[in-house]
Amino acid sequence: NVNLNTFDKKIASDIALDIREAGRAKRDNQGKIIRDNDGKIIKVPGTLKHCKAVGWYIEEYKQAQVSINLTNYKKNSIHKTFEEVRKQARKRGVRVTGSEIVGLLPLDALVSSGKYYLKKQKRTTGLPESDLISIAISSLGLNDISIFDHNKKIIEILINTEKTSFSDMKLKSFINNISRETPTPGGGSVSALSAALGAALTSMVANLTYSKKGYESNRNMHIKRSEICQELLNEAMIMIDEDSRSYDEVINAFRLPKKNSEEIKIRQESIYTAT
């Protein structure tokens, strides 16, 4: 929902008609609706694909809103839609004050918006996901009428909230865990951490070089490299936990009983799956 600095629902509805894929009824010079030979209303398509929209007034906020449903955010992004509403609002003498997201959304939807606004600022996009999310939240004005808690709005974060993660530990706690008389976290997790740190350092170098004078012609290369490093960093962070999880599964599989042919078969299948 995109918020406008007006009480007028008609303005919000007019914007909705102009942007939604279904568009609005075509009219003649006298304002009469034009129909085809079968009597069906001829429509003028809206400016955005994969977009349904309506305008309304929210008494609670004392603001008009353009309420939007994006049916394919990968083909029509949140930021593209937000910017189009801003453009249409300016034509009508009003301005967008911010927006809100009702329900949940995929992580990629916010990350791609963060990258879009960083590119507009001519800044590097090879940054941690948390930074990209923060940029998206501020650029889309998601805190305009209520606090936007991305930990409660992003699907992937909600799915992983209940999982215990070594990668979320403080460094000192993680090191102490390694030193204990338990097999996990072990060498694989430490190696994954080393890989993550290496990727982070390489990303830092690429990002520092991006903004350095004299390297302007190579900016695209540095952005690409820093983004690749961020992907590798994220993969390595996942592997910190995956190595320990895999080890535990293998050990549990080897501990299964093997007193008869059926148990032996189940045990072998479990070992195969775990490895």
Predicted segments — roles?
Residues 1-169, 180, 258, 273:
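Long, contiguous binding/interaction regions
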Residues 211-258:
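A structural-propensity feature for long, helix-poor, extended segments
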Residues 1, 243-275:
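Amphipathic alpha-helical interface segments
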Residues 174-178, 243:
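Short alpha-helical scaffolding segments that buttress acidic/His motifs in well-ordered protein cores
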Residues 1-2, 178-205:
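Conserved phosphate/anionic-ligand binding catalytic regions in large, soluble enzymes, centered on
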Residues 167, 171, 179, 183-190, ...:
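Disorder-to-helix initiation segments
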